[in-house]
Every structure is written in C-alpha cells, then in structure tokens.
C-alpha cells in the first residue's frame, strides 16, 4: 500500500515537473485579447508561443512575436517590421525602411496615426520596430 502511494506521488510530481519545464522553456499557450492583430489573429484566438526558436536564430521581419509589457503578466502580440540598425519612418500611411517603402502583403490599410514614427527612428543593436496588423 505504501509503495503504491509513493509511486503515485512520484508520477504526480514528475508530470508537474515536466509541465513546468515545458511551459517555462519550450512553449506556452496564450490567448489573443483584442483586435490589434486582426485580420491575422482574432480576439480570443488561442496560440502556442514557441520559446525555443530565437535561442538558435534572430527574429526576422514579419515574424509575429509575443513580448512582455511594462506590467507583470501583460504581454503584447505584434509583427516585427523594423530590424536592429534600420531606420523606420511612417510617411503618408506607409512604412519606410531605410528610405524604401516596405511591401506589406498581409496589410492593405494605410496607417492612420504615425505618432512618433512620423519622424525617422534609427533602431539600436537590440531594438525592433513592431506593429499590429490592424492599422
């Protein structure tokens, strides 16, 4: 009886341990909250976030990423538009990278409010420029 209980407890601890390792280092489920990535992602869509790929390669333009915001347990889902070292600017509703208009096949709408990006922004070595698809 005692041996059976110890065995059950061992497997319970093992399952929780493996689950913790997987969600911490490999992948994690998240839910889309809002329309900022519409039409690509919809409100309440469920996603699996890959936590491994960027350990082996750098993020690329047009990748969709999940990143933490300033507050604990708050994350954004956006698309990478500008890469480290590039200069990004939004003119007349379109994104320009290093002075060349960016071809965005996933987004046909013009950007209504360029905000700070109406002036050129040169990205640092570890900076990315991200936007939602719903502009």
What are these regions (language model features)?
Residues 2-6, 10, 16-17, 21, ...:
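Soluble "head" domains of membrane/secretory-pathway proteins
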